[in-house]
Regions:
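Glycine-rich phosphate-binding loop at the start of an alpha helix
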Residues: 94-95, 117, 143
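ADP-ribose/adenylate-binding Rossmann-like module
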Residues: 103-116
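Predominantly a Rossmann-like dinucleotide-binding segment in NAD(P)-dependent oxidoreductases
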Residues: 15, 140-209
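Conserved G/P- and acidic residue-centered "switch" motifs that form tight phosphate/ATP-binding loops
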Residues: 11, 111, 156
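Rossmann-fold dehydrogenase core element
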Residues: 122-140, 160-164
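N-terminal glycine-/serine-/threonine-rich beta1-alpha1-beta2 phosphate-ribose binding loop
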Residues: 1-103, 121, 125-130
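Rossmann-like NAD(P)(H) cofactor-binding subdomain of soluble oxidoreductases
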Residues: 92, 112, 136-142
Length: 209
């Protein structure tokens, strides 16, 4: 019999959790057993669509999350999950990932992985130290056409990369039509520009700056 995986959500500041949670809810081998928000670095000044309160209630209602905790550390201790989905502010990724790792909980981290390279390297060190699996929810690298392009480039079959140009149409970290004062402070650094730079670094095998 295949193992059933217990999954918890930590952080509801990122609007992508509404899509990510749907995938775990629909997967027959994963159970969304609980969720908990983190304490915001900057309190939200407005209620509305794609705020953290709205995201939490949307996920709780639509994906039948049975328990919501005030403290994510208590949730980790009580629920003993196999996997924690981390969708808090970018600046809190390291802290939350560490609390999961010391408890032996594997993590899925919403892109971008970290606010800067030093934070990312520390997260890798923690993952190795505590023997937990860590992956970044970065769908662009799962697309077969991009893997084919990278393979052809690595094999020298379609020339040499000279320059990357990226055009991004993006509504920001909250979602279409949602504008909430203060969100930029907790979303940066490591926002959409850092996220866009990851694909060229991966394709060209260059180290991120």
């Amino acid at each position: 019999m295949e193992k059933q995986y217990r999954v918890v959500i930590i952080g509801f500041s990122h609007m992508h959790i509404n899509d990510v949670a749907a995938h775990f809810y629909e997967n027959p081998r994963t159970d969304l057993v609980a969720g908990a928000d983190t304490i915001p670095l900057v309190p939200e000044l407005k209620e509305g669509t794609f705020t953290r309160k709205w995201n939490l209630e949307f996920c709780r209602t639509n994906f039948k999350i049975p328990k919501i905790y005030e403290d994510y550390r208590e949730m980790l201790d009580q629920e003993k999950p196999d996997l924690a989905v981390i969708t808090c502010e970018n600046a809190q990724h390291l802290e939350v990932m560490y609390e999961c790792a010391v408890r032996g909980v594997n993590v899925s981290i919403e892109k971008p992985m970290a606010a800067d390279l030093s934070m990312a390297m520390e997260m890798i060190r923690i993952s190795n130290t505590y023997g937990v699996k860590m992956f970044v929810n970065w769908p662009v690298t799962w697309r077969p056409e991009l893997h084919l392009m990278k393979d052809l480039l690595d094999e020298g079959k379609i020339g040499r990369i000279l320059e990357f140009k990226i055009r991004v149409s993006h509504t920001g970290p909250l979602g279409d039509g949602a504008k909430h004062p203060g969100v930029k402070i907790t979303a940066e650094p490591g926002g959409i520009k850092a996220n866009a730079a990851e694909a060229p670094c991966w394709i060209s095998a260059a180290m991120a700056l």
